[in-house]
Amino acid sequence: MELVITGSNNKVSVSEAVFGREFSEDLVHQVVVAYRNAGRAGTKAQKTRSEVAGTTKKSKKQKGGGARHGALTAPIFVGGGVTFAAKPRSFEQKVNRKMYRAAICAIFSELNRQGRLMIVDAFDLEATKTKDLIEKLKGLDVGKRPLIVTEEASEHLYLSARNLPYVQVRDVQGLDPVALVGADTVVITADAVKKVEEWLA
């Protein structure tokens, strides 16, 4: 299949397996959730009644008309332990390489179908100027949250986009499903398209 390069009459031939794949919502959801879970610290820690510092001596006598109480480390007391205390754990989920790549292909294909994938000849700046980047993006009409994908990392481009909170810049090696799904428009260079195909084909 062929896709038009924005701003010219040229076309680029792309693999249908990468940019024309059927969209699987379940697959993409599973991979996105797994990717986000892998970024969780999982360091939350609370103490149970047996771990809280304090005496376990009975706090008051059994009889006398009041409620029956034992140790002050019980969960019902302030400063006592937590009933179902959270412990550090890993939230990581196993995702096969084949599944991950299939999900990336499905996302690219859906972006293409929805007209949210924009291919350009090149995307670079001569100097580190945020103003220049803003003007360039306005000319492309990419929406509020664009993702710019280049073949290799560009220092001028990265630094210019750094203080634009909704603009993301990635090279092909740094692509991930969350960035692709969250973008209004993905602006990708023709060279980056070829590199994506090499990675996913």
From Swiss-Prot:
Family: Belongs to the universal ribosomal protein uL4 family.
Source organism of the structure: Xanthomonas oryzae pv. oryzae (strain PXO99A)
Region (Disordered), start-end ranges: 44-68
Protein name per its UniProtKB record: Large ribosomal subunit protein uL4
Subunit structure: Part of the 50S ribosomal subunit.
UniProt cross-references to HAMAP family, sorted A to Z: Ribosomal_uL4_B (MF_01328_B)
Entries under PANTHER family matching the protein: 50S RIBOSOMAL PROTEIN L4, LARGE RIBOSOMAL SUBUNIT PROTEIN UL4M
GO cellular component, one term: ribonucleoprotein complex
A GO MF label: structural constituent of ribosome
